[in-house]
Amino acid sequence: MDRSSKRRQVKPLAASLLEALDYDSSDDSDFKVGDASDSEGSGNGSEDASKDSGEGSCSDSEENILEEELNEDIKVKEEQLKNSAEEEVLSSEKQLIKMEKKEEEENGERPRKKKEKEKEKEKEKEKEKEREKEKEKATVSENVAASAAATTPATSPPAVNTSPSVPTTTTATEEQVSEPKKWNLRRNRPLLDFVSMEELNDMDDYDSEDDNDWRPTVVKRKGRSASQKEGSDGDNEDDEDEGSGSDEDENDEGNDEDHSSPASEGGCKKKKSKVLSRNSADDEELTNDSLTLSQSKSNEDSLILEKSQNWSSQKMDHILICCVCLGDNSEDADEIIQCDNCGITVHEGCYGVDGESDSIMSSASENSTEPWFCDACKCGVSPSCELCPNQDGIFKETDAGRWVHIVCALYVPGVAFGDIDKLRPVTLTEMNYSKYGAKECSFCEDPRFARTGVCISCDAGMCRAYFHVTCAQKEGLLSEAAAEEDIADPFFAYCKQHADRLDRKWKRKNYLALQSYCKMSLQEREKQLSPEAQARINARLQQYRAKAELARSTRPQAWVPREKLPRPLTSSASAIRKLMRKAELMGISTDIFPVDNSDTSSSVDGRRKHKQPALTADFVNYYFERNMRMIQIQENMAEQKNIKDKLENEQEKLHVEYNKLCESLEELQNLNGKLRSEGQGIWALLGRITGQKLNIPAILRAPKERKPSKKEGGTQKTSTLPAVLYSCGICKKNHDQHLLLLCDTCKLHYHLGCLDPPLTRMPRKTKNSYWQCSECDQAGSSDMEADMAMETLPDGTKRSRRQIKEPVKFVPQDVPPEPKKIPIRNTRTRGRKRSFVPEEEKHEERVPRERRQRQSVLQKKPKAEDLRTECATCKGTGDNENLVRCDECRLCYHFGCLDPPLKKSPKQTGYGWICQECDSSSSKEDENEAERKNISQELNMEQKNPKK
């Protein structure tokens, strides 16, 4: 800005200042004209003198005195502010060093390198301050010399007073610095708003760490070393760049310039430029000092933060997590404290701690003076919760002397507290006792504890999920409303389906971290404390336990309802544990008796099958009724046993008679065979006599030529009479006829227990499937589907269950060709291999075999490979993976060509399969067989009637 056209107007400026600030000359006793030796005041005075002499009309001495006094006061106050700021910085640094030394003595873990660095920093700061003081003294001496040179031509008395040497001026400035701080309200320059530390400390909202508003706005410096350079060149450059403090000063001083004498402008420009350069240099020094202070302040803040973090990391090797809310935020108002005996961690607000005594192992060092213990440690017990089966966590005592988890008491509806602030004592009598064991927990790993305690439900609408509070806490399903929300019940829980996934994830992580820390042994925690501290903790713990015992003996009896409320014994987790321990000591296994908790309404006779044990009249009646029923059942069992013995004796007698009848039946069958052969010969003779071929009647037809029915199983029998008693093919005994199972291949009966492996129930037979024994399944038939049944693996691939199949296209040359099969005309039978009979086997007779001797797999003949290549329905190609062969017609079908279409093979291991056509033809054969039986019976009746 060009200030050459502006002239100084001293009289209007002085008058306006005095009027604006209500100046009183009586208070101007501390201002002396002869002490105006500062650079700014002297510079201004010389400038005024040069202007007045150049114009030919020198200004009055009073105006010069006022101008000098104003400039002097401004300079003195600036120096006082500088010195006070430096002293405060030194005092704060000393205090910081003292605090660091104390922390080093307490912790004893600070490295030596940091100490050496800090000492070097302190020495550098002291050197910088000494340099600044020397620089100030030099500038003061230069200003005094310049003011003396400027005031020597003047003849006014003030010029005489300003002629003393440099030592006098320095002593005057030191006296002014030593004087108490006093604000000069008569200054015209809008200087920086500096506030003393005393006034800042008196403010309510003042924070020394955030005191950034009083610092000047300066241009960014590349480094801290830029503020430590000596010389005036750097200061002048900074003054040109800033333009904030110096420009304002120049503008304020430019307002007082006089525009009436243009002739003296050339003579005053040089002196004015010198004065302005000096004033700007002083302002730059002040700005640089403030910049240095601000940078040192920021460095101190970062150092304090870094040290506090290191100290906290050394003190807290882990993050404390509250065992109630699973939060890890520890604040001064709600600190996470730790029991000095068991090591459990909890918020003060979550546990109802009044805050008077804090834990030694807590996160706040200033409060870590008094040991703190949870209620269970104070009483010296290992409690068991009445509301859940879990034993971890922090407990509160009830008014009846029982114990519950504090988290269970908060989340279970109906539980009340005597003192809401301290969350004690807990009252369970207001809760309905029917809730005990009413619902089954869906998260309990042990089903024996699923109905212990009280289960809460999911707070989502219409959700029927029930779980224990601590089981839900393990899964991260517990939630709490915010403090600003006004809700009657701020504690709620959701099941896995309705809970927030992210919220559940971090709670689950915190719970696992809490459990991993709680598993730390007490010996490891004791190692962290000195023997003296551990002894002090144990002594205080014994005092607390003595007080708790005394309070328990003098505590008034809690209120209980007059009528005793029943509660199931199985709903108490502690009772279940004791019963399990008793069973273990008695040698009784609890695993073989599964607990059936299903509440069945009633049995067939209207009586309840099971009722949970409880001290109620209903359970007593059920108990006596059960005993009476047990006696009746035992008597009935004894009677049935006697009847069984009698029937077994009768069965033995009947077996003897049965064997005799079988022998006589065999003789009669042989006689019948002879007579039938004679009849056939006579019938053939009659045919030759008549010259015609006569059809043999059914009565003369040989049994081997008869088509066996479906019920007969396809085997040729010499008698149409069914067997009355069947014998087991393995044990050769005929007992337990209802447990005999017929093999559809070998037509032998087997006991379920005699099979390998034994069966527990009868296999299910369907219309299109049958059952065969293990012997027939291994090597008795040519069915390859059972052997080649594809088993689906977990990864989605399939493999053969018993053997690996060779490729379809590979056919060995040394394999003999299969025998030619000739289809049998007329009607088809139900038996296996009846649609196509090889020429080599068609003349063999099927003799009912006796029990097949079990042979090892190595002695059996290798099975012929069953290759399936063409579908009988669509005539398309295929292989063993997508074709199935019918056991009757031996034709192949695609899985999708069946009716209904299937995705996999209908054959199962141990079962056969026939197509739909064979199944319909077999039903027709049964109908034809029934018709033939009816015709034969009619012929027999006709033959008998003529004889009569």
From Swiss-Prot:
This is PHD finger protein 14. It comes from Homo sapiens (Human). Residues 60-71, 199-212, 233-256 have a biased composition (Acidic residues). GO terms for molecular function: histone binding; histone reader activity; zinc ion binding. Zn(2+) 8 binds at residues 871, 874, 894, 897. Zn(2+) 6 binds at residues 728, 731, 751, 754. Zn(2+) 2 binds at residues 339, 342, 374, 377. Zn(2+) 1 binds at residues 322, 325, 347, 350. Zn(2+) 9 binds at residues 886, 889, 915, 918. The N-terminal region, including the PHD-type 1 and 2 zinc fingers and the C2HC pre-PHD-type zinc finger, is required for binding to histone H3. Residues 630-678 form a coiled coil. Residues 288-297, 936-948 have a biased composition (Polar residues). The modification Phosphoserine is found at residues 26, 29, 84, 91, 196, 208, 290, 294, 298, 302, 308, 359, 530, 781-782, 835. Zn(2+) 7 binds at residues 743, 746, 773, 776. A zinc finger (PHD-type) spans 319-380, 439-499, 725-779, 868-921.
